[in-house]
Amino acid sequence: MTKLLSQIHTITDGNIATPKGFHADGQHVGLKHKSKDLGWIYSDVPASVAGVFTTNQVQAAPVQLDKTVIQNGQIQAIVVNSGNANAVTGAIGLTHAKTMQAVTAAQLNISPELVAVSSTGVIGQPLPIDTVTAGIAKLNIDGDADSFAEAIKTTDTVKKTITIQSE
């Protein structure tokens, strides 16, 4: 374990888009009052993916969708909103998650099967999908990667980020 830890180094000015071929952006689209609330991470090529999901019987629509998305072992993008969890929203919640997936895929010109979706925030409220889809159109491939970290905050007061390099 000590040898492994000695091979890990912190990158001071790094972010989610530091690895070659990765891009990210975050924007304020109106799900929250003032803060950034929508973002994505995009890879130039499909990347390996794994997931750990809740075993709770009640699972948010994005969780249900992403369980199927990761079965092929690869994703190329993830789109995330904060301010609304899209949880306990029934069939319309799953429809909205699939809409986020499809609109993101079209914006990035990739297959929807390569897009994961995540939502965090208030439970039990329908996701304002028109606001979200309009916001996806505002996201940039070469946007501000630090904005992504801001866009996924819920009640946090600071961004939680670390970038490391291993040998």
Task: Describe the function of each predicted region.
Residues 1-54:
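N-terminal amphipathic/basic leader segments beginning at the initiator methionine
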Residues 79-108:
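Alpha-helical support elements that line or immediately flank enzyme active sites
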Residues 41-42, 79-81, 118, 165:
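Short beta-strand segments
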Residues 41-74:
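Active-site-flanking structural segment that lines cofactor/substrate pockets
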Residues 25-31, 51-54, 66-70, 152-154, ...:
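A generic local secondary-structure boundary/capping motif
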Residues 45, 68, 83-85, 120-122:
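Short, ordered loop/turn segments at secondary-structure junctions
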Residues 72, 87-90, 160-161:
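Short glycine/serine/threonine-rich phosphate/pyrophosphate-binding segments
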Residues 98-99, 103-167:
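Glycine-rich, mobile lid/loop segments that gate access to catalytic sites or pores
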